[in-house]
Amino acid sequence: MEINKKNEIDVTENNPIIEKNKVPQSEMKSGLQEKKNLKAEGTKAENVKEVVRGKHKVLPCYDNRELSWLKFNERVLDEASDEDVPLCERLTFVSIFSTNLDEFYRVRVGSIYDQMIISDKKRENKTYMTSSEQLERIFKITKELLKKKEHIYNGLMKEVKNYGVQIVNFDKLSKEEKDGMENYFKNNVMPLLSPQVIGKKHPFPFLNNQEIYAVALLESKNNDKICIVPCRSSVFNRLVQIVPGSGRYMLIEELILHYMPMIFENYTVKSKSLIRITRNADIDIDEIFADEDISYRESMEEMIRMRTKLCPIRMEYSRVLDEKVIRSLCKELNLKKEQTFHQETPLDFDFVFKIQDMLRNRKELFFKRRIPQVSTAIDKTQPMIDQIEKKDILLSYPFESMTSFINLLKEAATDPNVASIKMTLYRVAKNSQVVEALIDAAENGKEVVVMVELRARFDEQNNIEWSRRMEDAGCRIIYGIDHTKVHSKICLISYKKDNQVKHITQVGTGNYNEKTSKLYTDLSLMTANEDIAKEVAEVFNKICLEQVVEETEHLLVSPKCMQSKIVELIDNEIEKIAEGKEGYIGFKCNSLTDKVIIKKLIEASNKGVKVDMVIRGISCLIAGVPGYTENITIKSIVGRYLEHSRIYIFGKEPLDKIYISSADLMTRNTVRRVEVAAPIYDEAIKKRIRGMFNIMLSDNVKGRRMKPNGKYCKDEITGEAINSQEYFFEEAYGEHKVEKYWMVNWFPDSFFFGSKVILWRFIFSFSVQSRLGRCPRHGVQYTYDCCRNYVSYERNIVSHVIYWRNLWYFACDYVSFEVNAVSHVI
């Protein structure tokens, strides 16, 4: 591994990890040879089975978007069964799987269901399935995945039991425990319940989205009745401790369900279960905006209220229910039997985070703590603007800290030479330092223009509140373009220097969100390139005029000039093959659904262009299909961090073109949103991105390769195991300057540095106390104070302020000791 003059790491040259896992040259076909082989074999392999739906022939290299997403969510679930993942983190993956599935049903299944109601004749454009055909497959696969989740969850809870925490059912309790639970229910739960028997004078109630309800079939003298009891998460603690001080818990909904006979004491309970409703979230915003008497922001608030009232799309239940109850619930909720899902696991997994809190002191049950590092490209003693003027800077999250970009904004907010800051915001943190910096800039007299996308799904309320605060501070807030979301991540800082107007431009792949920057992998480019600044300024100007950019020279900007330029760049690689040269395409993105780009990639593959793609989620293109995509490889990486960066590579070095982008290769991104992809002109950064891409392709721990049948499997580890995310963090920790405390550097790195501080101060304390001739209890008291300071210190490990404050305390302690020593002598 070499470090070049610009302190960028070359991870491709002489890298033993890549060399060990690299495919032998003899096994690799050149683009030209692949082209000859394809001609010899014909354009279609005889063993490829063709499918016809309606009047359409389905190519075997296409996959349905929704079914591909379900495969992705299964890969998330597979992480929960990976024994190399710490136990509590495996519980997290079960929770993520369930949350993902909830959102999938709310958004995607809800949309497909709406389409089916309008017309079931329309077919999607890749596998030509109708809406009803898609729903049938989705429901079938969902039930299979729920069984798999149940098996994994039960296994995990058996392991959790070994660490002293257990979730138990009522029938597993002892008599004393049952008596205690009955008293708890009577005194703490029953007075807060709102039970209801359904009848003519008591109509079926509105069931809130994703709330748990206890339902039962009651036998009465005249006829059977259905009753419902809300198990409100806002009222009750989800986990009820069975015996104070024990690690045995019961879910509140299970406790309520058990005591249904007590709640409805005048009836006989024939059957009972817990249910949970998922409501559609697919809403036509344009219908709300038709009211011209209210503002855009008020329209969005109205949409949020309306979304909670949309029709149910799914019902889950936890016990075998009487068919009469299921039919009645389906009728009231306007659901079909296929939209009901039985599962024995809890219906909501938010409680796993409370279990994790109970086990937080067991470090082996969690991922090793990782802290984003300051990039080696940045000198913390120099202004950010001055550094970016000298060279482009690339930040790689979460391995490198977002603090450097925030410092750039804070610097711009107070710099008297800065005239304006323009920025797009899609999803921001609840306590956003980014927005606070923009507010400070406006209050300091800068022109601050912020494009806030209020239509960021499920983040609308947060964006509405921040837009109000920024507006009150003097920022100019705009809300984008009708029918076109602004999803680009761009920031433009304009300032005067040497009687000239200059610019600093930032283009990123992810949101300006401090929280997700520690959880998602993203790239952020900061540059003083005036060509890029000019086109980013044009993007902002067009948005302000409710228009879109029609033509660019450097950037790729959707909806008008991204898809067409990507196709043009792919054509360039095809032309290289015709000229006898090597063609190459590399893509990293979250999803691939754009059929125009997919068809062009199939063409490139058939011409002999080598195509490597790292696609975390949906891929409507199946790799390795004979006669179609033989020269295409697709790998999905699902690990500790959510893969989120987008990279486009065209050609081999040194003539390659590399872009980082906010856009996935999805039709919604390339033709229905404002997205920006920025070219990388700095050679050191290009080399770094190529190296990162190659490491991801070599990932044989968290990477899963797509097979020609559309399924995914992990590569067999023949050389060294490569976890790309761990590799990048080790690189950040090893090659970058990890901040340590000078006073404890001589201790082994295996010691946690906080422990080193305690030990050092413990020794120092007793040595000084002995010198002063004091009794040992003073040393013990001082050690206790050291420990207390350490706890405070540990909570603020990232804060430089606390770091320097503790050093100051330490210095004061030392001075105090010296004064006491002098006093003792006197």
Predicted regions and their residues:
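N-terminal localization/anchoring segments of enzymes in phospholipid and broader phosphate metabolism
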Residues: 2-585, 603, 607, 617-744
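Cysteine-centered motifs
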Residues: 775, 786-787, 812
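Short linear/disordered segments characteristic of secreted peptide precursors
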Residues: 16, 751, 764-766, 770, ...
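Ala/Thr-enriched low-complexity intrinsically disordered regions
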Residues: 12, 40-45, 765-767, 783, ...
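Short, strongly patterned local motifs
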Residues: 743-744, 752-776, 818
